[in-house]
Amino acid sequence: MAVKLHSTSGGAGPDLVLLHGLFGMGNNLGGVARALQSHYRVHSVDLPNHGRSGWMDGADLPTMGDCVRLWMDHHGLASAHFLGHSLGGKVAMQLALSHPARLEALVVADIAPVAYPSSHDAIFTALDAVAAAHCGSREEASQLMAGHIAEEGVIQFLLMGLQRGADGSYAWRFNLEGIRRDYAALRAAPAGSAGSAPYQGPTLFIRGGESDYIGEEHR
């Protein structure tokens, strides 16, 4: 099953697809998109269960990759350059393994093609606290999350996922329960299918200087 993906596009040139990270949305990479629009036709895509895209159950890496492939079909993109951050990097790698001809080149930011241990318990607790409180302001949500998350930058990132409802209270734009159910599958390593052709296109991995998501053991 696939869902409709929301996207925005701008610029001119070869097609470049940007895929965001867990709990994010396409406009998280807005600065990157604007910087590259003078050289590329940049498409910022919301992954399933994120942003303004549709919600679904069973959104593992192969399913997310297939949703992106179908989005490409809908927009007439036979192939494109890809830049994926975190979860978006995993989805891009999965697409490269499943449908290598659809990628002209691949840039993966701050994630490796491996399975990761669970590391978001505090974040899920903070998100649950905000969801249960029906906060009337972003400041209230920020204060609630600060009781569980020490990093202010993480709190500010998550606040971007809030949307105000008709009753004035804030709720998460992303599918919190769906992401929770699929969390183990999203932590898995991208994997190709038996007999599938390997992806042999240009690939660049970018490691954050203070991040531990790409370690020396992944080099």
Q: Where are these predicted regions, by residue range?
A:
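Conserved HGGG/HGGXW glycine-rich cap/lid loop of the alpha/beta-hydrolase fold
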Residues: L5-G54
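Conserved catalytic-core motifs of eukaryotic protein kinase domains, centered on the activation segment
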Residues: N28-G30, S53-A59, P117-H120, E216-E217
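Residue in the alpha/beta-hydrolase core beta-strand immediately N-terminal to the catalytic nucleophile
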Residues: D46, H81, E104-V107
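Conserved acidic catalytic loop of the alpha/beta-hydrolase fold
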Residues: T63-A80
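Gly/Ala-rich beta-loop-alpha elbow adjacent to hydrolase catalytic centers
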Residues: G84-G88, A92
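Flexible "cap/lid" loop of the alpha/beta hydrolase fold
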Residues: M93-S98, L103-G136, G215
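Conserved alpha/beta-hydrolase catalytic His-Asp/Glu region
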Residues: S118, A133-R187
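Conserved serine/cysteine hydrolase catalytic core
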Residues: D167-R219
